[in-house]
Design a protein with these regions (language model features):
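Glycine-rich phosphate/diphosphate-binding loop of Rossmann-like nucleotide-binding domains
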Residues: 359-413
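Non-transmembrane, aqueous-exposed alpha-helical and coiled segments at domain scale
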Residues: 1-25, 32-194
Length: 538
């Protein structure tokens, strides 16, 4: 070994110290030492620096041995790019230097080359020769360049508020969601097999006179439902039917589980009461451990997505629903909930109820019967060269959802005319103004500009939906405004149809809400439109 040094250490001393931390004197750790010292020498004196390593192997230990940067204090970041490189940089400005092991400089170093490029199998590597080559090569096989670290890396993210996970009851960062990451399945441990209560089972021939512990489901070609209900006494006449259902042994209520377990019917009732909000109802009699939610009125279904995801992360609990923002009919089912096992652990039930304690999962909002006006723009229509077909199309959609059309008008593609007509319709009492066409990039299309002249504010122009990408939303005073692009004339369903129910329900719409429409926002333009019984808008 030569007399090269790594910082304050001889190579032998460094290898001994490295072995104490790393477990053995790894070649990558020795190279990491040379790389750290080279990077330090290239920084201005007195620089308060932080470090980035581009591989999780060996390099982080070299940085932690030779600097005050560590994973624990947040000054060492491991960004696994698979490259044997590191960077030291000014923690405030981000200006720094990157050092890497340069494969182009290894022709004279066969042991290093075989190790780095994995052309020499590990069992054939001569560790003594390899370490000797690394010691003699030192920084001569390294290259470096100036780098500027991205602002997003310099930004120090605060952990934020700490919450107690409703499942495991341990503290965790609230930013991770409603349940800690360990309880979402990211824990690196084998999950224990789910435990359950000891239940009383009897052979079918011995079940006569016993009380059924749960609904026993019968499935035929035409129906599915309970043949024997929970709490029902099993009679001799039931045995053949139960055998035909494949029942040879049945659960009976001879042994009641202890207080740590909750029967599916009791558990699902507790969950349903916590989930149902305004405009939602459900039967107080569970069927097969399940409860179905119904709309108590015609309206817009609102599902709290964060709560929905979190409650489904609680073990042994499930709830499934139709999509949020769909128009639902009174007395039609839209969601169902049930525990997975016959008896739900009280801890799981408590966790689910804790998730649901802040707000209801489901609401059905009333659709307001807004007094509406329709403003058609287009010189060709105003002059009678083209017959208007927009008014009946838009009017039908408004009236279908309970709105009334109090006035209509047709004006040319003229900013002043559009602004004046807008004001007339608002003065006539319009609570919702729907304009048609004039929203594209053509120079004659000035509908948006005319609306702005009339006082349009809170403007959202454009949505990731096809058809209907050039939809416009906004308000003039207390009057809400929706601009329908020309595609609304030939396409049966557009972005207007997705958003009109939200407007009528008084739901605030922001840019993020529009962005979320992109997933499912491509209409297949079927010859026979079946919306909303299709994927569009979902």
């Amino acid at each position: 070994m030569n007399h090269a040094r790594i910082g304050a250490y001889t190579i032998a001393e460094f290898l001994e110290k490295a072995g104490g931390l790393h477990g053995y004197p790894a070649p990558g750790l020795l190279f990491g030492g040379f790389m750290v010292e080279l990077a330090k020498s290239l920084l201005p004196a007195g620089t308060l620096f932080e470090a980035i390593v581009e591989t999780p192997k060996c390099m982080p230990d070299a940085v932690q041995l030779l600097t005050v940067c560590s994973v624990g204090n947040g000054r060492l970041r491991v960004v696994n790019l698979g490259r044997f490189a590191l960077a030291l940089y000014d923690k405030y400005s981000g200006a720094g230097v990157r050092v890497w092991l340069d494969a182009a400089k290894l022709d004279a170093w066969p042991e290093i080359s075989g190790w780095l490029l994995k052309t020499t199998p590990k069992k054939e590597q001569n560790a003594e020769k390899l370490l000797d080559e690394i010691g003699r090569a030192g920084a001569s096989v390294l290259s470096f360049s100036a780098v500027q670290v991205a602002p997003r890396v310099l930004e120090k993210k605060n952990m934020g508020a700490i919450a107690i996970c409703p499942v495991c009851k341990e503290p965790y960062p609230r930013l991770d969601g409603g349940v800690c990451r360990g309880c979402t399945g990211e824990a690196p441990y084998v999950a224990p097999a789910p435990a359950g209560p000891r239940l009383a089972t009897v052979d079918l021939d011995q079940a006569v006179g016993k009380t059924a512990l749960h609904d026993m489901t019968e499935v035929t070609e035409t129906s599915k439902g309970p043949a024997i209900a929970a709490g029902e006494t099993i009679a001799a006449a039931d045995l053949e039917r139960l055998r035909a259902m494949g029942k040879n042994r049945v659960y009976v209520s001879d042994a009641v589980p202890d207080a740590e377990w909750v029967h599916e019917n009791d558990a699902v009732l507790a969950l349903a009461r916590a989930m149902a909000g305004d405009g939602v109802c459900f039967s107080e009699a569970p069927c097969e451990g399940k409860i179905t939610f119904f709309a108590a009125r015609n309206g817009l279904l609102i599902v709290d997505q964060a709560i929905l995801e979190t409650v489904n992360l609680v073990p042994d609990v499930m709830v499934a629903t139709r999509q949020s923002f769909l128009v639902v009919e009174k007395d039609r089912g839209f969601a169902g909930c049930r525990p997975i096992p016959l008896y739900l652990g009280r801890r799981c039930l408590a966790a689910a109820l804790e998730v649901l304690a802040g707000a209801p999962l489901f609401r059905v909002l009333k659709l307001r019967p807004l007094k509406s006006a329709i403003l058609v723009t287009g010189t060709e229509v105003h002059e009678g060269r083209v017959v208007d077909r927009f008014i009946p199309v838009i009017a039908a959609k408004l009236e279908h959802l309970g709105a009334t059309v109090l006035a209509t008008d047709i004006v040319p593609d003229d900013r002043k005319a559009i602004a004046e007509a807008t004001q007339r319709l608002i003065d006539a009492g319009a609570e919702l103004l729907v304009t048609t066409a004039g929203l594209s990039v053509d120079p004659d299309d000035v509908t948006r500009q005319g609306l702005q002249d009339a006082g349009l504010t809170d403007t959202l122009y454009g949505a990731p939906v096809l058809p209907g990408a050039m939809l416009l939303l906004g308000r003039i005073g207390q009057t809400q405004v929706m601009g329908v692009p020309a595609c609304g004339l030939h396409a049966k369903t557009t972005a207007f149809d997705l958003l009109l129910p939200r407007v009528l329900a008084g739901v605030a719409i922001g840019r993020r809400d529009l962005a979320r429409l992109a997933d499912g926002g491509y209409c297949l333009s079927c010859k026979a439109c079946t919306y909303p019984k299709c994927p569009f808008g979902k």
